[in-house]
Amino acid sequence: ANPGDVFDSGSAFNDPVYPQFGVQCSRETAIQATHNDGNMSLELVVESVTRENRDGGQVTAIATRDKFYPFYVTIYYKTYPDCEVIETWTEIRHLEKKPVTLYRFASAFLPVRRGDNWLSHFHGPWGAEAYLYEEALRDGMRVIKDKDGVRNTQNSCPSFMLTLDGRPDEQHGMVIGGTLAWSGNYRIAIDNDNAHTTRIFAGINEDQSQYILEPKEVFTTPVFAFTFSDEGKGGVSRNFHRWARLHRLNHGGEQRSILLNSWEGVSMNVNQEVMDQMMADFAAMGGEMFVMDDGWFGDKYPRNNGTSSLGDWVVCKEKLPEGIEGLTASAREKGLKFGIWIEPEMTNSKSELFEKHPEWVIQQPHREMHKGRGGTQLVLDLSNPEVQEFVFGVVDKLMTAHPEIAYIKWDANMTLFNYGSTYLPRDKQSHLYIAYHRGLENILKRIHAKYPGLVMQACASGGGRINYGLLPYYDEFWTSDNTDALQRIFIQWGVSNFFPAVAMASHVSVDTNYQTGRKTPLKLRFDVAMSGRMGMELQPAHMTDEDKAFARRAIADYKLIRPVVQQGDLYRLISPFDKTGYASLMYVSPEKDHAAYFVYKLEQYHNMPRPAFRMAGL
């Protein structure tokens, strides 16, 4: 190869670092563009390679340009030696006289020599998120993708592991793991070609998202993070967990509070008396924070059900005559921190906001609007700077008026239907999927800059936003709306492959579960919740005195193991997906002087001995 060609150096591959559609067109590509003169090809050559230390890692930048057109692509690699993770992304720009259309713009290309390669990936609908699927890779292409538009981790997840030497194992084997740090639509293509190579492409899903790139405009792709371990899938997980806590997750090294959320306890039936009672009961159990969920807002249209009021973020005085200040004062008196629920990206057609600004919702000309939850919910157009200002103002006004708010649960309960924007110009309607999430990120950056100590949870119909694109601004995610203890073992097992316990909200709910109707012992519900960021999701008034006493002891026990669970190294021992009737995992402190060991019995067998469980990490 010529020195200037964009080829990998020092490996057995003769693949470009960033494959382009152009002179050679027969393979999958990372980038495809059409110049304004109609030429659909690119031919990139290297102009320079630079290195610098930046924000805890070393960044290598490979600057390339087209041989003929003033079209430039810079490929970045950022290495983190303290966790053995590499981030990669690209910047695309041009100095042509007229716009260039981008049809493909991957964040990453990763070629892997084919052997006995196995893919581990995670799928599942609402209430059954992140179920593990494993398969041997055969000829052809495997595509993992999402097109929800708002939430991107219900149905599938932008993460995978590739075991290079046979069937996947937790503690043995050579494994590559990858995850896309993006909150919008994504596409991960794993292509087994006839040259005995597995070629991996990861980035934004380009379907209905061709991008008109103006001269001098810079298009930056999301980060794709990847790692390698010869200690099996568990080694990959521990690398990602360290990377998250040290470099990616907001307040990643800080201890999380034990909280009670009001949703499953009282739904939208909030009022001052009930909130005071729940706080008093939880404080007596040793709790640390109370979070008031949906149902507290709406003036003209009080929020009594899911059909109205989103966008009208003012206190419903009928329910809370003392306002939020009455609740924060009550929490303070009881020694609790206070949090609140919002869904600021959404509105209802039955709301004062929609009556005032119908142009702010995502919509199409000459089409009837398809509405979501309650038959009235609509998505606000975050590509519009006025809407971004409004959404930022929701949080800013709450925090300015009530600085004692310590926690915000940020929800998003609708798919992006009615694809169209009254803000974007006619020739850039295809930007909406991307512009929506860039608008969301702009809002979150402003909130983070002004309120750096504020703790926020990413919720989206449960576990719809479990991704590293948002976690620099959120401290945790709601893992699933399904709080059934048995099913949570499976869900949390899947999520733990890429995300640390400190970010994984796991709540104790009632004995007849809200979603499944299953009855489970209180001890099991606490034991499962203790393996993540533990909280509660019930009405304490419905607990017996015996259950309250047990909860006090369990909360005290969790406080003892919280440092090792939230900041320790995870070792998954017996998988619930192996169908042995058991699941087991443990957390080990970095100094290896403390450990928390969990064993769950999933099925009841008569007169069957329990298998031996081998610990790890000590």
Predicted regions and their residues:
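Active-site beta-loop-alpha junctions enriched in small/polar residues
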Residues: 105, 183, 226, 260-265, ...
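Aromatic-lined carbohydrate-binding/catalytic grooves of carbohydrate-active enzymes
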Residues: 251-393, 402, 406-407, 418-419
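Short Pro-Gly-centered flexible turn/kink motifs
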Residues: 30-33, 46, 211-230
